[in-house]
């Protein structure tokens, strides 16, 4: 993978993906006929995805303000409560009218992307902003979070509108590929991982892809890029980076698998829902 979205030199490209995916999200929500359409997110309609985006975007702005002031943020909640807490946040905005909700999201989003655009190289790499669930993270993580949200949730809305076979744009999914390994690391279900000692491979085709070997042992997941997967107990092969991203977010069960069926089954049941 030649492109590293975490490097400052990738900033302009990453922010272009944010704007592109946000525009696609807005295209769906700006149609009033879509407001009450069910989405791929269980229990959420289009209006709730808008609520979710208000929740996280305003949350990022608040945390950025805390960091700029040099104040101490509340302790991270951890990932195991992420799904339930985000659900509460999204549904709390149902009291807003459609017009109020959309205006509030767009206002917050413009403020956040303006902050992203002004980040210096030192800030991109070293300015830490405390995430509600993850704790202190470097600034470059936050544009990626926006790509995850706008990219995957636009897919969720299109799924609800009838396009069940859609893929994320290759560039969008490609930018997210490195982050999927981090998500896997932090979402290992400790009960499912008990006694698991496996090594498996990930292969993603195309210019955004590569090969990685993953080891799971003692409830911990580690990974490294490799040239050879011949000693992996199983291999998950994704022909499009979208398949990897949507599988990570448990929207689909994508890719082709080869190797030990027991290992494949363990991997598929290794992660809790985020």
Give residue spans per PLM region:
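C-terminal interaction segments
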Residues: 227-274
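A glycine-rich beta-turn/hairpin centered on an aromatic-Pro dipeptide
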Residues: 173-214
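Short, helix-capping/interhelical loops that line the mouth of catalytic, cofactor-
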Residues: 1-11, 60-118, 122-125
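Hydrophobic packing residues in well-ordered alpha-helices of helical domains and bundles
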Residues: 15-18, 102-105, 143-146
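Acidic/His-leaning functional-site neighborhoods
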Residues: 204-233
